[in-house]
């Protein structure tokens, strides 16, 4: 035993304590650390010592004698002849107690590992349940939203129904009011009543009707009664032989006077006629003949023109009133000698007044001017006095138009008098004109549709006709497109193929596909095998080979396999309807047979043989080849060099269709749609019932999660149990039962086994759990047997306590060495008080709080302060955990108040544990002392949130040993090294250690203003106080004569640059071979030359001079950037910009960057500027840009100048433009502006293909000279006003005046040059303002629209519509750079017209050599990339001389070797498709830098072999 330590004066100070790695595996109770240290010194570098350290448990007999156990085998390390000897031993010289202790420790470690595995499995299950809860919650929310939408629709329909009912009633009322006696229905009723009244009157008053005697004989006479019925008051015929007047009078005299009877009989006879005359009267022969003669005479007089024209007029008339007027006017027109064909058209489409005026003129009484004037006056009076649906202005306009048409018609009449149209020509012309009129009226008609929600949509039928014609033309020219070389897009069939593998004859692999109820592949893939292994979407199964299908005149066969039951959902291919030369696509797997890839190209089909230019590889045999419709065309069997050889199977399966019992993708989609629609139509009650079921299931899942969390916590708490019935308490010898026999006993019940299977445990994991449980049960059983008759229980308990404490320390150290990620995934039990807070919502907040021993109460108090009782809203989660030596508290779903947590991010507090044994009369007492020390800066940073109490406050007076330890130098903490490989996050760029660090991406807005800096801003640093530095000196140094000198400010800045940058790191590279470029140097002439761009030309007032083109360009810009509408002005403190840039004048006098200024003074000046009313003018600071330029420009001092303002003004502009700029950056693939675009990962190819589609085959490249400086102020301010228009009304109302002031400062600048001159510039877009590129894009967009509208006007005489312009013109623009494609039929582009237009209208400079026309994108350039298409994809070729010049004459020094390596890799990426010599040169330099880095021990990232190709 070691002594208690020195206590008296002159005692030797204790030696610094250093914990040895591997101490956890030792079980010797005394002097472990010193023995291990001496053992390492003696054997640390030998192989025997390394193998000993690989054992599970190590026992130190002495420095030269060690035992170890691994599994069930013991090993011994001794010294033989001065050398360590490590060997296995079957019977080690150990006591049973020592063996039991080593076995117990080994078992405890095994149980600890299994517990960790079980804990991880449970936590994974918890995460899955949480995901399921989240999915159900989302589904519940979607269902509720759907119900709300249905309710809104039902309410809208109800309201619409009510509106329609009210409208119907109103229409009925109006209809009743309009029904008058002059209506057609009333007129018919009136005629009916008149007819009835006439009949009744005639019946009452009688008539002059009488009989007519027919000159025919009759054998009998009629009596008086018969005569009276036939002849009195009736028109009838009576045979002359049957009439006897005297006998009739005598018979009548019986009733009345004889003379009266004779008179009545005489009056009843009207006359006498022959039999032929009777027939003519009965059949109305005379009337019919007269009618026929009249018609014939009319036809002969008027020909057939009049009736035909009248007939068509009546057909085309709009109502009955118009029909009557038209018929009358036609008759008058015929009488007046007017031509009936034009008169018919006038009657049909012109007002009736126009036709009447033409008839009046035809009478010959009024001249043309007079009738025209009267016609116009009449129509105007009608427009004013007679109400109509149209506006009065529209009606007056119509009156004027038809008044102009009237003399034109009359003149046409007069001209037609000199010609004669035959009857047949009139008929044909009339029919054609009427038919065309009907068709035109139908096409131009407007259709109104009322939606169920009440919205009304209108469209014209002519648009549908255009769409139909476009569809027909698309189908008609589809084959032509293929011939022209345009590769079509193919449907994705990535899920339709499977991987087939066989083990016969060394094994082979290929691709299979489903056709009907079988899977097919190439015959040589399966060979003679009977069983094949099929893999689809990670699912693997066995399938029988049913046979081979012989292919006619082909060397290979087509193998047919059955479909395994798990693969019933494998999509089915559909056969192509025809096979002909066209573009095809082959679907297969990559070289590793992991990911699906495709090959596309032109296929030549010769009979059943198919050849395509696919450079395939082993493993692609059996791949399906599809046509442009996604239908199965053929099968790939192999390749010859770069030509794929396949077989067309359309005719093979034509007689025996393969698709019999399966459903196609379209049928399945239709069925799914029908099911979805059926589910939508269920009633509200059913939806409510479903919601209740989902809520119950959600609650049940939440309960399961809570139970699992509790189980997890209980499992972790069990690690602290200190009982002899555990692994840590086992130290006794075994009894008479066989361990092998016990391990065969049953541990899990059937219910427990099934529950583990349902929870996702595999058979191997269940077996490990069972083995661990059995091991635990076996040890417990041994403990129970040894407890009987055991008297020395106190010493055993003390020994158990010591072993348990040692194991706890080892477990705690191992858990702490797992890294930061472990605390975020598990709630770990600690011996000291520890808090962990995580809240995920709009932003992620994580905090860890650690307390030394003795401060558990304070930990609980802080926990109660941070965790509130408020529940988090939906979509946010939080977890809080408190770990104490005797309990664990966990809370989830509550809002956490982080203001009680004070973070110290620059300090690391480590814990070192020291155990001292003090010898006292009352016995041995184990004391623990924990000190909190500050770790070195190179150690990883751990967040510490509550200041740690001083250790002196927790020490007790009766512990002098601990106080002495406190005064010694702090021991260096032993930490487990992180052995994982370094990785770089692709999202945020942060480097972390794999498998050790739990990486959380940082926010991409890394340039947010820092907090702090509350020192008041002195007046001499404010942006609007620059005038105090200006002296009234008229000293002209570089400013041209036509610009004023406002004063002079004395500043100490570089004016001329004559030396180039010297970078020592570049000395280790070979000098590149490049010429024509260099880094910039300049003299004072460069400042003078920078003013030339403002004086190239003056713009005209294009708004007044070209109003139509201006309106067209405005409409085009609005259509393109309409996504900016509804943006907001953000607070200035939320803006983001580069804070390491110059703070401009006057802040640059005291600070090198904006960051320094903000750290000192904060953002109060920024906020005051945004909230106040501004009327002053900021000062703009100018300096020349150091970059790589052409040697000619450098020699001519043609250097670009940067103009920037105070960062307060810059951030003010950012508050106005940030949201709009972000929206533009998000739409580079679908819109013109390319701010934030990338050419990599196919980005350049997608954009070039987009702009050259839809017939836009002509490519135009245009580059302005001095674009920023020559932009007209009127145009620039117009774009700024357009951006203001896109803001919300609230933002415009609140910040409108401030925005107007800011916009004015952009083009009216007080400018300070490095020479100290202060001048006034009133033109151009300053290159240092926040939105320079975005504003240039808008100007570019506007000018392009104006340019093509101008060209179209020159070619066709009209300005195109915005729709036609956008359909025929598409382009990419980045600032002043533009690549455009247009349809050649749209404009016949003339470069000289464009040059003259920009110079004469806008005062802008376009050089003739900067306008280039191409028939294809090849050779054109955009953003420094010259477009080429080497492998079917558009890539960019750069100017390697300019890029490599940065390695020869750099513009700035590189900070370290890693930066040089990164620059070389970046240059190789850019030059990959350019000069091969440049790529080879860069590869050699990269290799040289990597060799140097390895020699210096510098770790560089690894770049794969295909990195440079795949990134494009």
UniProtKB/Swiss-Prot annotation:
Domain of life: Viruses
GO BP terms in the entry: DNA-templated transcription; proteolysis; viral RNA genome replication; viral translational frameshifting
Classification via Pfam families: Astro_VPg, RdRP_1
Residue positions where O-(5'-phospho-RNA)-tyrosine is found in the record: 753
Keyword Membrane tagged: yes
Segments passing through the bilayer: 190-210, 295-315, 323-343, 360-380, 399-419
Gene Ontology MF: a single term: serine-type peptidase activity
EC numbers: 3.4.21.-, 2.7.7.48
Site feature (Cleavage) residues: 204-205, 478-479, 717-718, 730-731, 809-810, 954-955
GO annotations of cellular component type: host cell membrane; membrane
Catalytic reaction equation(s): RNA(n) + a ribonucleoside 5'-triphosphate = RNA(n+1) + diphosphate
Family membership noted in the UniProt record: Belongs to the astroviridae polyprotein 1AB family.
The protein, known as: Non-structural polyprotein 1AB
Native species: Avian nephritis virus 1 (ANV-1)
């Amino acid at each position: 035993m070691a002594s208690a330590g020195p206590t008296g004066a002159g005692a030797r100070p204790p030696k610094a304590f250093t914990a040895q790695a591997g101490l956890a595996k030792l079980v010797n109770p005394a002097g472990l650390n010193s023995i291990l240290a001496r053992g390492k010194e003696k054997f640390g570098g030998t192989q025997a010592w390394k193998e000993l350290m690989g054992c599970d448990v190590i026992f130190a007999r002495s420095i030269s004698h060690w035992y170890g156990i691994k599994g069930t085998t013991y090993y011994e390390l001794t010294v033989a002849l001065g050398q360590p000897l490590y060997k296995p031993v079957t019977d080690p010289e150990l006591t049973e107690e020592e063996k039991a202790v080593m076995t117990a420790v080994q078992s405890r470690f095994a149980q600890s590992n299994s517990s960790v595995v079980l804990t991880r499995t449970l936590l994974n299950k918890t995460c899955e349940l949480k995901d399921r809860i989240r999915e159900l919650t989302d589904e519940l929310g979607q269902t509720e939203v759907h119900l709300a939408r249905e309710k809104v629709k039902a309410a809208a329909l109800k309201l619409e129904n009510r509106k329609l009912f009210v409208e119907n009633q109103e229409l009925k009322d109006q209809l009743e009011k309009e029904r008058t006696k002059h209506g057609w229905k009333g007129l018919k009723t009136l005629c009916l009543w008149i007819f009835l009244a006439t009949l009744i009157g005639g019946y009452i008053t009688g008539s002059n009707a009488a009989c007519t005697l027919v000159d025919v004989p009759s054998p009998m006479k009629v009596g008086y009664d018969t005569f009276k019925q036939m002849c009195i008051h009736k028109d009838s015929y009576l045979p002359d032989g049957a009439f006897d007047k005297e006998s009739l009078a005598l018979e009548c005299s019986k009733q009345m006077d004889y003379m009266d009877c004779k008179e009545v009989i005489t009056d009843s006879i009207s006359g006498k006629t022959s039999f032929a005359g009777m027939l003519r009267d009965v059949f109305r022969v005379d009337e019919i003949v007269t009618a026929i003669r009249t018609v014939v005479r009319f036809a002969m007089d008027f020909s057939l023109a009049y009736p035909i024209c009248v007939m068509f007029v009546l057909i085309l008339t709009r109502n009955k009133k118009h029909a009557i007027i038209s018929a009358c006017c036609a008759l008058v027109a015929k009488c007046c000698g007017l031509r009936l064909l034009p008169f018919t058209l006038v009657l049909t489409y012109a007002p009736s007044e126009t036709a009447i005026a033409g008839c009046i003129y035809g009478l010959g009484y009024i001249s043309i001017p007079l009738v025209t004037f009267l016609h116009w006056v009449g129509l105007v009076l009608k427009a004013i006095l007679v109400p109509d649906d149209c506006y009065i202005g529209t009606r007056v306009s119509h009156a004027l138009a038809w008044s102009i048409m009237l003399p034109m018609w009359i003149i046409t009449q007069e001209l037609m008098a000199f010609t004669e149209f035959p009857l047949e020509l009139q008929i044909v012309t009339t029919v054609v004109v009427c038919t065309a009129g009907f068709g035109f009226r139908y096409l131009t008609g407007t259709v109104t549709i009322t939606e169920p929600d009440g919205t009304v949509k209108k469209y014209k039928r002519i648009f549908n006709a255009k769409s139909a014609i476009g569809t027909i033309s698309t189908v008609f020219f589809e084959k032509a497109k293929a011939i022209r070389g345009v590769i079509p897009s193919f449907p994705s069939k990535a899920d339709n193929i499977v991987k087939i593998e066989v083990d016969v004859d060394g094994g082979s692999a290929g691709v299979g596909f489903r056709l009907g109820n079988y899977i097919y592949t190439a015959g040589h893939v399966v060979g003679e095998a009977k069983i094949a292994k099929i893999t689809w979407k990670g699912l693997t199964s066995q399938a029988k080979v049913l046979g081979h299908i012989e292919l006619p005149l082909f060397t290979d066969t087509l193998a047919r396999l059955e479909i395994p039951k798990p693969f019933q959902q494998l999509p089915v291919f559909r056969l192509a309807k025809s096979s002909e030369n066209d573009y095809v696509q082959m679907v297969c797997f990559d070289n590793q047979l992991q990911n699906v890839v495709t090959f596309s190209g032109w296929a030549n089909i010769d009979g059943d043989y198919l050849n395509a230019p696919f450079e395939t590889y082993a493993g692609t045999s059996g791949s399906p080849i599809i046509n442009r419709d996604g239908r199965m065309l053929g099968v790939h069997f192999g390749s010859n060099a770069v030509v794929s050889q396949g077989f067309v199977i359309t005719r093979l399966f034509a007689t025996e269709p393969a698709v019999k019992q399966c459903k196609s993708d379209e049928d399945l989609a239709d069925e799914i749609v029908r099911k979805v629609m059926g589910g939508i139509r269920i009633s509200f009650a059913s939806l409510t019932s479903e919601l209740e079921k989902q809520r119950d299931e959600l609650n049940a899942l939440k309960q399961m999660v809570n139970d699992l969390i509790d189980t997890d916590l209980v499992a972790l708490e069990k690690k602290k149990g200190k009982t002899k019935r555990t692994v840590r308490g086992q130290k006794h010898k075994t009894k008479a039962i066989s361990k092998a026999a016990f391990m065969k006993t049953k541990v899990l019940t059937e219910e427990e086994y099934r529950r583990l299977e349902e929870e996702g445990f595999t058979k191997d994991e269940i077996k490990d759990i069972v083995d661990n449980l059995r091991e635990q049960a076996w040890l417990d059983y041994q403990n129970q047997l040894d407890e009987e008759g055991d008297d020395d229980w106190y010493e055993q308990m003390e020994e158990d306590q010591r072993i348990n404490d040692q194991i706890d320390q080892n477990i705690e150290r191992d858990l702490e060495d797992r890294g930061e990620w472990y605390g975020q995934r598990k709630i770990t039990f600690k011996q000291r008080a520890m808090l962990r807070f995580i809240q995920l919502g709009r932003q992620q907040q994580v905090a860890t709080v650690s307390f030394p021993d003795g401060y558990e109460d304070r930990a609980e108090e802080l926990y109660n302060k941070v965790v509130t009782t408020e529940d988090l809203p939906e979509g946010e989660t939080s977890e809080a955990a408190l770990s104490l030596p005797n309990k664990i508290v966990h809370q989830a779903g509550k809002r956490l108040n982080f203001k009680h947590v004070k973070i110290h991010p620059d300090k690391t507090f480590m814990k070192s544990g020291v155990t001292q044994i003090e010898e006292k009369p009352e016995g041995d007492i184990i004391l623990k002392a924990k000190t909190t020390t500050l770790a070195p800066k190179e150690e990883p940073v751990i967040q510490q949130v509550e200041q740690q109490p001083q250790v002196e406050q927790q020490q007790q007076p009766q512990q002098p040993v601990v106080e002495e330890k406190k005064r010694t130098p702090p021991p260096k903490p032993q930490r487990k090294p992180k052995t994982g490989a370094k990785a770089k996050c692709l999202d945020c760029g942060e480097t972390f250690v794999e498998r050790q660090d739990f990486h959380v991406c940082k926010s991409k807005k890394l340039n947010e203003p820092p907090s702090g800096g509350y020192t008041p801003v002195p007046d001499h640093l404010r942006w609007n106080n620059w005038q105090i530095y200006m002296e009234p000196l008229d000293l002209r140094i570089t400013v041209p004569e036509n610009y004023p000198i406002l004063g002079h400010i004395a500043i100490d800045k570089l004016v001329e640059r004559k030396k180039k940058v010297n970078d020592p790191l570049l000395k280790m590279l070979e000098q590149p071979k490049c010429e024509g470029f260099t880094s910039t140097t300049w003299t004072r002439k460069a400042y003078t030359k920078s003013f030339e761009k403002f004086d190239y030309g003056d713009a005209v007032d294009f708004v007044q001079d070209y109003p139509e083109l201006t309106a067209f360009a405005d409409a085009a810009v609005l259509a393109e950037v309409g996504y900016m509408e509804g943006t907001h002005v953000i607070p200035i403190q939320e803006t983001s910009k580069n804070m390491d840039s110059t703070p401009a004048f006057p802040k640059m006098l005291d600070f090198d960057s904006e960051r320094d200024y903000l750290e000192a003074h904060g953002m109060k000046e920024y906020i005051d500027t945004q909230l106040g009313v501004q009327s002053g003018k900021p000062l703009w600071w100018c300096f020349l840009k150091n970059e790589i330029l052409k040697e000619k420009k450098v020699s001519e001092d043609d250097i670009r100048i940067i103009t920037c303002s105070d960062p307060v003004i810059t951030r003010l502009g950012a508050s106005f433009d940030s949201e709009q700029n972000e929206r533009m950056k998000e739409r580079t693939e679908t819109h013109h502006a390319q701010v934030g675009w990338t050419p990599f990962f196919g980005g350049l190819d997608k954009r070039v293909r987009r702009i050259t589609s839809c017939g836009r085959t002509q490519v135009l490249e245009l580059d302005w000279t001095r674009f920023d400086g020559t932009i007209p102020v009127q145009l620039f301010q117009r774009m700024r006003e357009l951006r203001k228009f896109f803001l919300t009304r609230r933002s415009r109302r609140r910040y409108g005046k401030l925005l107007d002031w800011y916009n004015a400062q952009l083009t009216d600048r007080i400018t300070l040059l490095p020479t100290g001159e202060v001048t006034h510039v009133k033109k151009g877009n300053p290159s240092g303002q926040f939105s320079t590129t975005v504003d240039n894009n808008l100007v570019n967009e506007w000018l392009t629209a104006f340019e093509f509208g101008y060209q179209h006007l020159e070619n066709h005489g009209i300005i195109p519509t915005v729709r036609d312009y956008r359909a025929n013109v598409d382009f990419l623009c980045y600032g002043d750079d533009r690549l455009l494609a247009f349809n050649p039929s749209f404009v016949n582009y003339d470069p000289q017209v464009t040059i003259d237009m920009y110079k004469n209208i806008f005062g802008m400079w376009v050089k003739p050599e900067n306008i280039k026309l191409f028939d294809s994108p090849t050779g054109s350039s955009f953003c420094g990339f010259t477009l080429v298409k080497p492998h079917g994809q558009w890539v960019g070729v750069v100017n390697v001389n300019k890029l490599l010049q940065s390695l020869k004459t750099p513009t700035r020094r590189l900070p370290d070797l890693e930066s040089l390596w990164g620059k070389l890799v970046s240059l190789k990426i850019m030059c990959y498709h350019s000069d091969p010599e440049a790529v080879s040169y860069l590869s050699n330099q990269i290799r040289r830098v990597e060799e140097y880095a390895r020699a210096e021990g510098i770790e560089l990232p690894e770049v794969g072999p295909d990195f440079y190709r795949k990134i494009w």
